[in-house]
């Protein structure tokens, strides 16, 4: 998509959000970011999202490198859309061997960075263990079902504790 077409779409609000990190290289994304910054300086405000899809995940070269963090009230389609529309989203890219980069309003970036440093890796460890047990179950491990059942709800409990929802 040409810069002029992107500009026309964003200036006329034909899109609900701008896929800021949609390329597969720093070069492609740098141009998108520069265009977005230019539009912001001209008064055009539009929410950002990271990559909306991944191609060629077999070798995983580009899989999971670009993402969107959305601060929605609930994990529902409507709440996610509403959060993005109100600029409660952050575009993020993370290339192998490099520090991640976050793009959005300062407040959103600061919170996303905090979660990246203190929450996401711990949450991922819990999910990894559940995934490992699911794989073992499918492979015929007779004990995996009981161990998986014991893990049930641990990610929800962790999130509730981390965000102070379990304190009454």
Where are these regions (language model features)?
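Charged catalytic cores and adjacent phosphate/nucleic-acid-binding surfaces used
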Residues: 2-168
């Amino acid at each position: 998509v040409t810069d002029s077409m992107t500009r026309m779409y964003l200036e006329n609000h034909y899109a609900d959000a701008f896929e800021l990190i949609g390329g597969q290289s720093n070069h492609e994304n740098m141009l998108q970011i520069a265009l977005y910054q230019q539009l912001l300086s001209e008064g055009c405000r539009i929410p950002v999202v990271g990559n909306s899809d991944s191609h060629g995940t077999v070798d995983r070269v580009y899989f999971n490198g670009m993402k969107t963090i959305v601060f929605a009230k609930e994990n529902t389609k409507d709440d996610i859309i509403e959060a993005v529309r109100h600029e409660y989203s952050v575009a993020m890219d993370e290339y192998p061997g490099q520090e991640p980069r976050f793009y959005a309003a300062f407040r959103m970036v600061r919170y996303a960075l905090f979660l990246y440093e203190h929450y996401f890796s711990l949450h991922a460890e819990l999910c990894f263990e559940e995934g490992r047990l699911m794989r073992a179950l499918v492979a015929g491990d007779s004990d995996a079902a009981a161990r998986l059942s014991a893990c049930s709800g641990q990610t929800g409990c962790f999130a509730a504790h981390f965000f102070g929802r379990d304190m009454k």
